[in-house]
Amino acid sequence: KLEIIEVADEKTPDNASETVETNIKNKEAERLLKYIRDDAYLITLEIKGKQLTSEELAQKIDTLGVQGTSHIIFVIGGSLGLGEEVLKRSNYALSFSKMTFPHQLMRVILLEQIYRSYRINCGEPYHK
């Protein structure tokens, strides 16, 4: 079952200081963490995360399932990134690129890769 939950970004003032940006990320993190189950495997999308091929992501998802993980949560950060508490809670940091993308576009890319992973794991030809 796939469920998409969107948590609104905090408004960021122009020329916000680092302290203000940290406070904003912390507020967003607090809201995000309310949706993350204790037994879930949390994958955060981060520029500094590990880059995987589609096949490697499929293998990661398959391995989690074999290990008995029934809830996998992917988190895409807002325009400022993810707050420290979400990063601490993360089980795995994943990167699709060293570039920055709008989070709405990243959602489409992530959903396509999740779909592709399941097709790969089912031995279907979609990933070619």
Model segments located where?
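Structured adenosyl-cofactor binding patch, chiefly the S-adenosyl-L-methionine
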Residues: E84-K128
